[in-house]
C-alpha cells in the first residue's frame, strides 16, 4: 500500500502505526520515536509533519550524534556575531529555522547532559538563548525526537535526564524492526 511518496508497506503493524501517527499528527505534543537503526524513524517523523497542521511550514532535522557538544549547541540554538572565534555573523539555529514548523532531534540519546538541560528549558519556555546572545527568542516548534537506545535505561544509569525524557516522551511511537516486516 502506497501510504505516502516515501512510505510503501503491506505490513499490518506498520499500517497500524501509520494510522496512529496520522491520528496524533494534529496534536501539538512532543513525540518520541524509538526503533533500531535504519528502520525509517526520520521517514515516520516527516510523515507526521506532513499530516499535521504544520505541513506547509518548515521540517528541520538534526542528527544529535553527528556533531560535538559545542557545535551542536550552536546548530540547535544559533549564535550571535562575536560569540566565539569564527562567529563573524549571527547564525539562526535549527530551532529558529523550524519556527512554526517541526524539528526532528535525531538520536537524542547522544546529546550530552549539559545540553539536555538547555533543551529542557527550551521545551518548558518555548524560547531559545543563542550562544553569546543577549535576549531570549520565542519559538513555536513541534518537537519530534528519535532514538535507537533504551532511554529509560539511560535515565536509570544517569546518562539521560528523567525530566527531559518525560517532556519528550509525551506520545511514544515504536517502529517495528526490519526483520519483522519482510514484505
Give residue spans per PLM region.
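Conserved catalytic core of Hanks-type protein kinase domains
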Residues: 97, 122, 145, 167
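Conserved post-Walker A coupling segment in P-loop NTPases
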Residues: 6, 19-85, 96-112, 140, ...
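Conserved catalytic/switch belt of AAA+ P-loop NTPases
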Residues: 81, 114-138, 148-156
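Loop/turn-to-beta-strand initiation segments
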Residues: 99-102, 118, 139-144, 161
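A short beta-strand-to-loop transition that corresponds to the Sensor-1 phosphate-sensing loop
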Residues: 107, 145-150
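Nucleotide-binding/hydrolysis machinery
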Residues: 4-6, 10-15, 25-26, 52-57, ...
Amino acid at each position: 500500500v502506497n501510504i505516502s511518496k516515501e512510505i510503501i508497506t503491506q505490513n499490518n503493524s506498520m499500517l497500524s502505526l501509520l494510522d496512529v501517527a496520522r491520528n496524533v499528527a494534529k496534536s501539538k505534543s512532543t513525540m518520541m520515536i524509538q526503533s533500531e537503526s535504519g528502520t525509517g524513524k526520520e521517514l515516520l517523523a516527516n510523515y507526521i509533519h506532513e499530516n499535521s497542521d504544520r505541513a506547509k511550514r518548515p521540517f528541520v532535522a538534526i542528527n544529535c550524534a553527528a556533531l560535538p557538544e559545542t557545535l551542536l549547541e550552536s546548530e540547535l540554538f544559533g549564535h550571535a556575531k562575536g560569540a566565539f572565534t569564527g562567529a563573524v555573523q549571527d547564525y539562526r539555529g535549527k530551532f529558529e529555522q523550524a519556527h512554526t514548523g517541526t524539528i526532528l532531534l535525531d538520536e537524542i540519546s547522544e546529546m550530552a547532559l549539559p545540553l539536555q538541560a538547555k533543551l529542557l528549558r527550551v521545551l518548558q519556555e518555548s524560547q531559545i538563548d543563542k550562544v553569546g546572545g543577549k535576549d531570549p527568542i520565542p519559538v513555536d516548534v513541534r518537537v519530534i525526537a528519535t532514538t535507537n537506545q533504551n532511554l529509560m535505561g539511560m535515565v536509570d544509569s544517569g546518562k539521560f535526564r528523567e525530566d527531559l525524557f518525560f517532556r519528550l516522551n509525551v506520545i511514544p511511537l515504536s517502529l517495528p524492526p526490519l526483520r519483522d516486516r519482510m514484505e
